[in-house]
From Swiss-Prot:
It comes from the Eukaryota. ARM repeats lie at residues 101-143. The chain crosses the membrane at residues 7-29. SUPFAM superfamilies: ARM repeat. It comes from Rattus norvegicus (Rat). This is Armadillo repeat-containing protein 10. Interacts with the DNA-binding domain of p53/TP53. Disulfide bonds: none annotated. The modification Phosphothreonine is found at residue 48. GO terms for cellular component: endoplasmic reticulum; endoplasmic reticulum membrane; mitochondrial outer membrane; mitochondrion. It holds the Pfam family Arm_2.
Amino acid sequence: MGGARDVGWVAAGLVLGAGACYCIYRLTRGPRRGGRRLRPSRSAEDLTEGSYDAILSAEQLEKLLYLLESTDDPIITEKALVTLGNNAAFSTNQAIIRELGGIPIVGSKINSLNQSIKEKALNALNNLSVNVENQTKIKIYVRQVCEDVFADPLNSAVQLAALRLLTNMTVTNDYQHLLSNYITGLLHLLLIGNGSTKVQVLKLLLNLSENPAMTEGLLSAQVDSSFLSLYDGQMANEILLRALTLFQNINNCLRVEGRLANQLPFAKGSLFFLLYGEECAQKMKALACHPDVDVKEKALAIKPKF
């Protein structure tokens, strides 16, 4: 290998920590021009512990992606994904990673049976998805991620990572339709998940609820009657406020479409029957006296719709 190529390989090794650094060293252990070897200016541990805040160059990212694509070592794979994910938080690198063909390389890792690797891949895709152009490439993974959300261990880090990616991918209306067949499953996950899972599912549903094109799909989704427990006065505010906003958004979309909720044909057991039923009306009435001002205002805004 030439001197410039050796530098690139060693730089990539530095990024990945002690284990990956050794791997790269083995690949480049031959002498450089002049018989000298490149010595790292900083410890590899600094680069993987979050104390190294430099943005990687395009050349370093290219070597990192090559290593990620070619290695079978789970430790190196995980370190590479973490490093790529951290660098994907920078807008400049979001474009560079796409242009280097990095999105399919990262995306392939969500198929890993190693839950930690899968989580890190989802986190990296999540950061990359902030870039609108990147979303056009990430969209091919949306349906798989939806399927995996329901198969992943409940309340696990990998499940939350998947939900965060789906939330980012539904900030705009462009890809929300890809989730149409998964709304019932998301509502079920909302009910059985812990507080963190509930909040993340609600963030995702809130994105969908702002789009009039998704309103009918939301209201027709089958959901257990325990959904109304989200509107109990003792529910944590971070959940209660989002659940109320979900209801508000649906009402707003119906108004934009010039439709009345009671004119829409939905089956029993649907979200429609719960939101516009007598039990929910009573809950809104009770929340209108809630001590939290924000909760009270939202409940009062919803109450006249009954």
